[in-house]
Amino acid sequence: MRIVLSRSAADYIRKEAAYLRGHSRAAGEAFVARVKAVRRDLTAFAEAGQLLPVPSVRRLIREGYRFDYRIRPDVIEIVAVSSSVNTPLDMPSDDPDFDYET
């Protein structure tokens, strides 16, 4: 199955690769290789990602990045890519030592 990127996903990938290359060429190349691996894996295992509450959207988390995608009849569309490392919690933590004062 063919994999396509939404405009916002493609923009994020370009910007993230440029940012990483600015700090380390190897890090930038590793990120691009990670994106290629996700595309290859989704071709073989389209339903690998977890279903999200958004209708027909799945999420695959790979090495610190979230890849949100939709499976269409003839194509898989990656609709969003984002870092999962520096993202605040969406809900309160289960950790009893969690500090609510941020």
Give each language-model segment a name.
Residues A46-P55, F67, N86-M91:
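Short, charge-rich, low-complexity interaction segments located
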Residues R2-V57, R72-V75, F98-T102:
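Basic, Lys/Arg-enriched alpha-helical interface segments
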Residues R58-G64:
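A beta-hairpin/wing motif
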